[in-house]
Amino acid sequence: MSEIEKKLATLSNGPGVYLMKDESGEIIYVGKARSLKKRVSSYFLEKPNRDLKTGILVKKIASFDAILVTTEKEALILEANLIRKHKPRYNILLKDGKRFPSLRIDVRTSYPRLEVVRKVKKDGAIYFGPFSSAGKLRSTLKIINKTFQLRKCKQKEPPKRNRPCLNYQMGQCLGPCCLPVDRDEYLDMVNEVILFLKGRTNDLLQKIKEQMAAASERQEYELAARLRDRMFAIQATVEKQAAVTTDFVDRDVIGIDREPEGSAISVLYIRGGFLLGSRNYNFDEVLGTDSESIQAFLRQYYDKDRFIPDEVFVPCQLENMELMEQWLTETAEKRVVLHWPQRGEKTRLIEMANENAHEALKDRISSENVFKSLLERLQKRLRMDRPPRRIECFDISHTGGNQTVASMIVFEDGKEAKSEYRTFNIDSLDHPDDYAAMHEVMARRFSPDKDWPTPDVLLIDGGKGQLSITASVLDGLGVMGAFEVISIAKKDEAKKETMDKIYRPGQANPVVFGRDGDVLLFLQRVRDEAHRFAITTHRKKRAKTIRKSALDSVPGIGEKRKKALLRHFGSIKRLKEASPEDIAQVPGISVKRAQEILEALDA
């Protein structure tokens, strides 16, 4: 009897969690079961209709562990915690990507305002969203700003001002910061905004009509005209929208599609009967049925800081439907309905979500095939043993040699891997020296104490000189030859060159790409991304320096002049070395003020 058979014989029939391991002892799958014995044993029984990926997984299982718990709810929670901890290859794993924005309004403040947030908190405020694109969010805010006159200032309560801001002059704010604005009237307008964002436009239009009629009876014709304009603006907006349901319920609709190459899950955001947007999630190798995949997805997707609507539609019957509904209700701290529609108009929503997932998966597979071909041709041009999976690119950015920052960006399988991006602050230089900066960066990147993945290709932004210094440093570190090192130099238009050039160490002539021009374009894209990231990081560092500099102690120098001085001289050190006449060249600075600046800096 094998070790697995011995373990199967001792398994309990109670609920629990099981961890499948490969020959190296790595956990490759975590699952939960109502009956551990039945579920785990099913993996090792021959089944003619077995899922393809299940068959692949079973061949890789060398051992397993099982954890017995008291209830199915405990198993559900433990499974999610173990998946989060071990990140098994064959489980659904949601990456911590940037969340879609939502709108937040806190009606407990004196004069509530709308703000854009990416985290939904249980703080008593009202949230609307998520908005699947910044464009849709901006369009919604534009309509609200034109139609309603909510304040825009960022403080929790309106700041005290002597005169109203530009928004008041444009008719887009009532000016509660300095004008006597009736709070009850303002809150009426806030409630109208809430009705608008909930999609209850019929109720809103009826309310505005009643207010308009009442204002006319009181002979408040200016107010009646404003209400009329607001009503027309809302009607024009509603005409452009198409409702997907006849009720006003907020719901998320989940769809799924699976192929041998991977799977995709799509979420449709329906708010107040209108489709607000959608988001697709792609996964590589995933084990289990649609039910298991959807259940694992829900546990991670709604785990924290996420708006949970009143209803969640799923495309199939889940094994633990009641348990999942209970968990959603407890997490949301309100009643949440988990439903599998099987008839009527609601099944059309599931079809839409499934089709969305299908298109997302099809696009992803097509994209992967394109990148696979591209990387295979790059392998051929660089004469490598295998296609490069991980490409790292470095770039240097500075202001006259000061505040030098080096960026490292990573592409994996042809796509940006932003979680792998790194920055290096080069504080040892106070003058322009890209070679010295690159020397320090390479020494730090490939230092023995850095337990980072080894790249297949290291791409340097620069010509033969940059490549030579990089190769020299790598050779000194003992890593030269462990991966391919190349540099990308811009075309020399004076020599009538038509494309950028790729150089390899020890070769005078650039690599010839011939018909593989798209491979060169890909490397240019990698270089441009490194350049973008370096500049963005450098700007942040420079802004931080501007905020906290020796100039803060100089009387009469505000933020605007401080920026102008640092932009002109590049650093405090160079400013100190300048003459009063040189400093007076900066707009807004007189010779007398320049002398005061130098005296303050020397103090």
From Swiss-Prot:
It is found in: Cytoplasm. Keywords: Cytoplasm, DNA damage, DNA excision, DNA repair, Excision nuclease, SOS response. Residues 13-92 form the GIY-YIG domain. Its main location: cytoplasm. SUPFAM superfamilies: C-terminal UvrC-binding domain of UvrB, GIY-YIG endonuclease, RuvA domain 2-like. The keyword DNA damage applies. GO terms for molecular function: DNA binding; excinuclease ABC activity. It comes from the Bacteria. Signal peptide: none annotated. It holds the Pfam family UVR. The keyword Chaperone does not apply. Residues 202-237 form the UVR domain. SMART domains: GIYc, HhH1. One of its GO terms (cellular component) is excinuclease repair complex. The UvrABC repair system catalyzes the recognition and processing of DNA lesions. UvrC both incises the 5' and 3' sides of the lesion. The N-terminal half is responsible for the 3' incision and the C-terminal half is responsible for the 5' incision. Interacts with UvrB in an incision complex. HAMAP family: UvrC. NCBIfam families: PRK00558.1-5 (NF001824), uvrC (TIGR00194). Belongs to the UvrC family. This is UvrABC system protein C. It comes from Desulfatibacillum aliphaticivorans. The lineage of its organism: Bacteria, Pseudomonadati, Thermodesulfobacteriota, Desulfobacteria, Desulfobacterales.
